[in-house]
Amino acid sequence: MTAQLTQELPEFPTWLNARPSTLQEHRGRALVLAFVNASSVWCAERLAELAHWQARSPGRLQVIVVQVPRFDSEREPQRALKQLRGHGVSAPILLDRDWETWRRFGIESWPTLVLLDAYGRERQRLVGVTGDLDKALVALCEGQQLPSDADLHEVAERDPEPRLELRFPTGLAATEDRLYIADTGHHRVLECTHGGRVLRQFGHGNADFIDGGVGEAAFRRPQGLALERDQLYVADTGNHALRRINLRSGQVDTLCGTGRSGEPVEGPLAFAGASALHYPQGLAVADNQVLIAMAGDNRIWSYDLGRAALSARAGTGALEIRDGSGHLAAFAQPAGLAAVQQVAYVCDGLGSSIRTMQLRGDLVQTLVGGQGTWQFGDEDGPRGTARLQFPQAIALATDSPMLWIADTGNGRLRCLRLGGGELTTVLLPRRLHGPAGLAVAAGAVWIAETDAHAVLRYDLASGELRDVSIEE
């Protein structure tokens, strides 16, 4: 395309983690305007690619993230900031609350990257997750001056997240005396007592993709957990891999995944890297299979532990909501999973819905929500009228008909009695901050309060909600 000076940003934008600035001020170095949505895993992937490129080429590229809300909760500055920081974003973020910047630049879908050269001229647009980003950025930065000392020392984020024992925890698993936490922002998995004392740490805390013992292994933004006897299965989301922790030996190994996103391949795997995965997020174990909510390709997959084989169970791959059998059904970024008695329960995040999949026949049906990918709300009641907003986690005990739901966008814990019950909100003393992980065990619902960097315990008998103080 012919290079031309680009539009300026709106006059009074909302900056979430940086001082207000104009595009004019950023001239002198190449700049990417990244139009994204914080709830989209495709956007999270593009942002991770940009951050990786900046780390490899310090001082050469500036990035401004333009957050365009899909959900009502994302219009709240603090919630939008937390979501993006949860993806590891530290670049300046502009909240385009009413889509003004989106319209000004003529954006049609997210993620869209608008590439501006050092003179403020638009050179290219990359739409979606296809296209050679590395090649485009190399060409964009070609010929510009070497970065100065000031360029190499980027301005620190305004009001950074506090340094706490946990950072954006997500997946949980629990037994009668143990609690397992995916400490996502610290790239590790913790084994704790119910009181919060850390017994073991799996993953040394630096983002990497390494198998090995307790002090050697490494994860990258792990999320979903599923426990089966002495094996803990981990959705190593940032590495696009399915990992396994042997709780007797502490050994971590990779069952499937290459460390990079890609199209999964059905069939037996000769070795772990024989098939890529695409943003695995939720896990459940049933019938010697690890069920995988593959948020990046909008399908439910399974990994056969006996045959070391991958199978696509349900979903077309299109981001839609449609009931039906197996590959006739469609999901909208499935996130959380639970399974019991030959049924898998799925949190369909962008569909703001709860779906079921029969493990015999793979028939998919909608329990709550499912009216469309832009239909959401905060409403209890019969299944046909109840509403959720971007639910991310689901849990149930094997001996109870109660389904527990982390209604992430609404900051609520919801429950649904199986067999015809209505959706109800659990009365808590306060609204939760981005809950994105659940487990049920030992008379309690364990909640990963992700945006607050905390884990909570909700006592089923007394209704008491308290913090689990994590102590290393």
Set out the residue ranges of the language-model regions:
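Short active-site neighborhood of thiol/selenol oxidoreductases, capturing the structured segment around
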Residues: 22-44
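A short, hydrophobic beta-strand/beta-hairpin element that forms part of a small beta-sheet core
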Residues: 100, 111-126
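Conserved beta-strand positions in repeat-built beta-propeller and related beta-rich domains
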Residues: 181-185, 234-238, 278, 292-296, ...
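Short, internal strand/loop/helix patches
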Residues: 81-109
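Gly/Pro-rich loop segments of beta-rich domains
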Residues: 150-170, 196-221, 251-281, 309-333, ...
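Residue-level detector of Asp-centered blade-edge/turn motifs that repeat once per structural unit
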Residues: 174-176, 227-229, 285-288, 339-341, ...
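N-terminal "domain-start" segment that seeds a small globular fold
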Residues: 1-23
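Structural microenvironment flanking redox-active thiols in thiol-disulfide oxidoreductases
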Residues: 44-86, 100-101
